[in-house]
Amino acid sequence: MAGLQLVTPASSPMGPFFGLPWQQEAIHDNIYTPRKYQVELLEAALEHNTIVCLNTGSGKTFIAVLLIKELSHQIRGENGKRTVFLVNAASSVAQQASTVRTHSDLQVGDYMSEDMTSWPEEMWNREMIENQVLVMTCHIFLHVLKNGVLPLSKINLLVFDECHLAITGHPYREIMKICEGCPSCPRILGLTASILNGKCDPCDLEEKIQNLEKILQSNAETATDLVVLDRYASQPREEVLDCGQYQDQSGLSERLLNELDEALNFLNDCNLSVHREDRDPTFISKQVLNDCRAVLTVLGPWCADKAAGIMVRELQKYIKHEQEELNRKFLLFTDTILRKIHALCEEHFSPASLDLKFVTPKVIRLLEILHEYKPFERQQFESVEWYNNRNQDNYVSWSDSEDDDEDEEAEAKEKTEANFPSPFTNILCGIIFVERRYTAVVLNRLIKEAGKQDPELAYISSNFITGHSIGKNQPRNKQMEVEFRKQEEVLRKFRAHETNLLIATSIVEEGVDIPKCNLVVRFDLPTEYRSYVQSKGRARAPVSNYIMLADSERTKTFQEDLKTYKAIEKILRNKCSKSAECNDFELEPVTDDDNVLPPYVLRSEDGGPRVTMNTAIGHVNRYCARLPSDPFTHLAPKCKTVEMNTGGYRSTLFLPINSPLRVPVTGPVMNCARLAEKAVALLCCEKLHKIGELDDHLMPVGKETVKYEEELDLHDEEETSVPGRPGSTKRRQCSPKAIPECLRGCYPVPEQPCYLYVIGMVLTTPLPDELNFRRRKLYPPEDTTRCFGILTAKPIPRIPHFPVYTRSGEVTISIELQKSGFSLSAEQLELITRLHQYIFSHILRLEKPALEFKPVEADSAYCVLPLNIVEDSNTLDLDFKFMEDIEKSEARIGIPNTQYTKQNPFIFKLEDYQDAVIIPRYRNFDQPHRFYVADVYTDLTPLSKFPSPEYETFAEYYKTKYNLDLSNVNQPLLDVDHTSSRLNLLTPRHLNQKGKALPLSSAEKRKAKWESLQNKQILVPELCAIHPIPASLWRKAVCLPSILYRLHCLLTAEELRSQTAIDAGVGAQTLPPDFRYPNLDFGWKKSIDSKSFISCPSACMEEDDDHCKLGTSSDSNHTAPESCSMEVSQPPEGAPNTPDEKLETLTLPVTDLNKDCFPNLPNGTQADSDDLPHRSDVCQCSQLGPLERDLSTQTTTSVSVRPSPAGEPQPWPSDECTGRSSDLCDPHVKKPTSKHCPKSETATSTPAPSETSSEDCRSACAGPAWDSPKTLGPNPGLILQALTLSNASDGFNLERLEMLGDSFLKHAITTYLFCTYPDAHEGRLSYMRSKKVSNCNLYRLGKKKGLPSRMVVSIFDPPVNWLPPGYVVNQDKSSTDKWDSDENKDLANGKASDDEDEDDDDEPEEAEVEPSKEDVNVEDDLEYYYEHIRFIDSMLIGSGAFGKKISLQPTDPGYEWKAPKKAHNSHFSPDGGADEFDYSSWDAMCYLDPSKAGEEDDFVVGFWNPSEENCGTDIGKQSISYDLHTEQCIADKSIADCVEALLGCYLTSCGERAAQLFLCSLGLKVLPPEKQSSGGSAELQYGWLKIPPRCMFEHPDAERTLNHLISGFLNFESKINYTFKNKAYLLQAFTHASYHYNTITDCYQRLEFLGDAILDYLITKHLYEDPRQHSPGVLTDLRSALVNNTIFASLAVKYDYHKYFKAVSPELFHVIDDFVQFQLEKNEMQGMDSELRRSEEDEEKEEDIEVPKAMGDIFESLAGAIYMDSGMSLETVWQVYYPMMRPLIEKFSANVPRSPVRELLEMEPETAKFSPAERTYDGKVRVTVEVVGKGKFKGVGRSYRIAKSAAARRALRSLKANQPQVQNN
């Protein structure tokens, strides 16, 4: 082996760093990274007449089109010249013309028919005027020239397609003759692909080229792809090794040859006459034996034996399937021969082990070469593993720049590694080329065998690939498909370096994507030039060897061939533009030039970083490679070297246009070209370092090492023991629940001034009839004067009125100051305190062991007490008399034990029972049930017939069951209702969270049920005690927890608002005295039916969102907004309030309405004036139309505004509103809805609130009403919405606001970064942006701002997680309420459950009338189930019985609900455990998942796994223990969401500037700070962003260059209807990074970064404000459907952006070309996905068309350009873009597209599984999705994401085809 000196990477002078074959692109160290050859050809063509010799047709068009575009400024305008494109055949005219049309906006004429030669001159003149580019056949052009129609002087460019024809006598020749005589001859471009065919003689070749050059007066530039490889890569070392003859000592080889030759002769002699169409019967046999013989001669007997074994197996298959007897005999004959060979071999060697005596010298030589590549010890195999693990993803999304920022960090890590030497240095990456398939297969076996026997070769992991079936166009059968797959797997492994040696047939020579190899062995010599060059070109690693193995007899002849090849190569290389000088010095040894110029040294110490002459070029290349670019562009520096007259050389270096160093760098004069290039690179490194583009190690600065540290205010990571990544959903932390300052420590003190507030309650929307199943009478709270008040020592700020939903309908609550400054005595206060405790402990039964009443210590302590009208003053005051009466009553706590006897019978007094709560005295003594008297049945007595057959009469029932005797058998009976156990009245029971009615079990059934006596609870007055608290007050008491909770939340929000007013200067710190925000409402009305609103969008804006949807009015008018719509129907005060009031009332003038409804509200009037106009009234009025319609069919109250589907009862709107929140999953569960609705629902619900907001937004922009609040800040209701998570199941949540905030945040930060760092390129900007908008950062800021404790995280469930005022959590006992302890939990809930059970009559026995327990007392069936479930759940929660499905769906299976997979964020803090969640636990924890629910009602079911989702911490599996009453547990990500939602809230209420100030106050800089003026307050003032000053570089004749570059853009401006004031922005928006001719502006990347955020914000804002009030789920889907590259690219093509696009990138050109063709055929927009389908039928081609990201980018960059050009006006951008996007927005809003992947996962959540990516042989990615039981589907694309969605699309198509019933939503 001595003769062979291989330079393996480790021994290379460049050091191990360059040996890594996988450095994705090797970086050259002493030549500038070469650019794509097409680019260089274009450059040449721009400089002089050129003949382009290319191998492919496509490359030629690219060069021709780009050249035409580059010179197009000469052909536009009045006396522009014309460009002529000549083709040889008429058939190619149309094709070339259409390519030019596609890629430019020039007018193209095509002329091909012979009769055009007879056209009169004026026709030609007209054509010349109309068209700028003329594509014609050479004959027509010749005619035109001869007739002088178009003089040559009017032509700027003449393109000859297939110009080699000019050598023969062809019209081209004559055309050129005419040109020769002409002084002003046009520029000439010749295109040819056929200069080299097969073997040709170098002399002929040279002559042919010279001849052509002469005729066309051009220089031939063969960047044929043939040389290109050489020219670029460092040349591999070529060796021809003569291996000598095989010495056949044993004679085995000879015997085998004889056998085979004899057999072959026999086959050849059988001259069977075969019909032409029949198969030759000996064909297979000959083929097999020839292959075997070839293996024998090339590899030797050992391999021939292996080959024979393989062949025998293959023959068996043929024999089995062969029908023809004769053919079969030949196959059997062959089989015998092969077996004979095997037998002969066995005599000489054992087939098991490899014996080198029986292989040829070539094989031995090959093994010796492989020995040389053995890695050093330390990195045997793990190195490969290490490598694979490191780079795994590189192979997948190697270029998918669209991946989100999430991956950026990961990527960064990877890149840095790639720049430094890896831990192992000498790894083989080699290919062995052989001629035949069998040679490859067997050689692979041999190498594997050798590896087993020779430890030195153990490092080799080889595989083979054969070209069989890789042909793209052959029909593929199953088996080929399998083969094909195998090959791809082989290639994948080779690319991933899992295998390091590939044995291949010529297939791998061209067109297959494989890594750069450092060893290429031609086992069989190349037979033609192309094969030589292609295989040599595979050795592209910087240190590589190209070894050709020859036998002695062929060595001589081959040496000759090799000379020929080298000569051809040389000729071609000389024709290669600019290549000559590179090669000369590439080959000479690296001399030490370092002393020519001193190195640039950073620090003088030894080994300090330095750049020397020799390393400078490498540094520049490496820098360029790190600039941002897309998969198609490899940025490289451009160096021009000129010879000076003085004799030296000077180079000028141009960096890619997106580098901040834009000025060309000119180097010193040196005495040779190579030194000049090195010197200029050295200078360039110095400049790059000085401007901060190279770091102090002189490596390119990554985007991470930003020089803008201040931007990334690096915060110390907080230390917490909490596991999980900060900012993620997985990490949860506890925080105390906030208590508003005004409620802290405000317990009244004797003799100190107090404030008394009245809790006003007005029924604004009575319950509609259809929901009033029991036909209960409604009890408007305003009918009785006694009510509750709040007594406190501190004033309470004004807050919006808000609704609660009782059994009577929607009640609007107001908190009004009644009197202040008075004081009370100690006795009075004690009485009040006792009564306060009595309300919470006895009436509401909220006291439990964990809570103690200690008003003085409690965090929030104020008194709740009864008020009544004082004598006749008509003013409310404290009702001391009533309090004293209660104290005295015996029924106050227990059950009085009055005994009635026959002597002292019971006497019935009707008036005692009119407004009474009664207690049965004969059961449940510890916690007696309390009932409202609903009706007195005077026609029934205890002797009436008992409803069920077991008992005759009621008296008998009581006697039998309880042994009770009645003293009065004539008393009437009482129909009673349970007092309410539902204490969460925040949202209505009958609606889901979206404000849609829940499907009810049919109304008729229910009515029937409640009307029959059987289903009523009937009690006997004598057996009951009357409670001292009247029913009317009791009903109000039930509302207290909800009212106080809502009050508390609104005050927290108000506090946040005034805090922000101080911090950010947005809004007023204190409100004007008479100001009140509009009511809180859920905005459902609006959304109820979008249609009604479309007419009046502004109508609904409510500003404060949540609250006031309708009521935007700022007054408190209690029109509860929600109620608004209903309100309409509500009669003026005097009218009887019965539900069936008919429509007329609707017509009331709105204003009165408001007044009437609240006649006595103090501030009822003010608002009307100003906001009504745009508030409810619109809704009201405009709604009348629709309302009327609806109403007529239903009773008024039900105004819900959406025509109800028949039979479905209308919900009461009011409820409606709330309902949303509750969205109960199961339709039936009425009651729970509100309270319990599973969190998830909430999620669904989200829409509501947000809806509201959207409106606001609009209003914000719009109406007058805004002025007032705008200056005050957002309505606390809206802030509350932003603080409410969907898990809280309230009537609103932050999701819609969050989406709006999210897009505004992105926009604000983007604009700030863009303006503040005019020099940072897009990669850096997006890195800074991703850091600032990351959830982790937002979470930090939100936490600093104190949001976690103010957020509303879990569902409000008074018995479980609400702390009544004046109570404290008793530490010792509190464990009972900790989330972790289960038993107590049960306790807690269990207990709750009883009282909750509103209807629970535990003892069915006494069903008074109840045959079936449930019927009886279920307030609504649901209520009952629900309670029940709750109870069960509470038990379950501890027991782990989660997997079971408890299905409670008595009715309506159609409404299936499915559960989600998300923890509803903080689900409520785990706490709620029991109760809380129970609801959801319905389906054993099934819960709705908003994220999945696509449309309103389809929810998705998943299973909730408490350990994960809920406890939040699943990480350490430890559960977080915390107190439910005073703490809440929140996922970090929810805090980040809340920050975005608050931003959305400020944005909609106060406008963009306020939102920016709000961000600055959080600590996110989005405005430049200003030095405050002396007079100003101390806090920081923020200025306005300034547009970056320069968009054009200093350049001698910038203006002229600009006009030259944008010639033709006028048409574009008129197309988009916007004229740029500064055209440089326009040019920049269309300049791709590869377009180096633009020397005056940057490329579009920065503008794209800006435009992307602007369009995202504008589109999101538009969708948010859509009157249809899309739900959050729909909003998300619409946003992703509209804001994505596919849509943008499609629109860009539709509006011709591609015709003005400036790029020099051949691959990009082709992708755009394909895409444009595709769009033209489709001619309609596509949804969601980046890979629009090509055509539905061609199933075989599972690849989708690729969407050129650059097209989407320029669509965005133009938006950025307009924004900057218009002085940062979003309106201007939207005026230009809305018309383009409108059709799509409308189309998608009507039918929301979902991404195929998501749709598939929703359709088959359990069964669809995506495979990891595989690489296909041409470098694309393939993904397979398996839908278990329904098949596997594959998709292919340039990135994993694209391939994945292609696979999903195929799967969907197939699934939908097979089951038509899959509804396509």
Swiss-Prot record:
Record key words, sorted: ATP-binding, Cytoplasm, Endonuclease, Helicase, Hydrolase, Magnesium, Manganese, Metal-binding, Nuclease, Nucleotide-binding, Phosphoprotein, Repeat, RNA-binding, RNA-mediated gene silencing
Keyword Repeat: yes
EC numbers on record: 3.1.26.3
Residues annotated as domain Helicase C-terminal: 419-588
Ranges where the Helicase ATP-binding domain occurs: 41-213
Site feature location: Important for activity: K1749
Transmembrane segments: none
Compartments in which it is found: Cytoplasm
Location of the Dicer dsRNA-binding fold domain: 616-708
InterPro entries associated with the record: DEAD/DEAH_box_helicase_dom (IPR011545), Dicer_dimer_sf (IPR038248), Dicer_dimerisation_dom (IPR005034), DICER_DSRM (IPR044441), Dicer_PBD (IPR048513), Dicer_platform (IPR048512), dsRBD_dom (IPR014720), Helicase_ATP-bd (IPR014001)
Binding site for ATP: L54, N55, T56, G57, S58, G59, K60, T61
Domain DRBM: 1792-1857
Protein name: Endoribonuclease Dicer
Originating species: Danio rerio
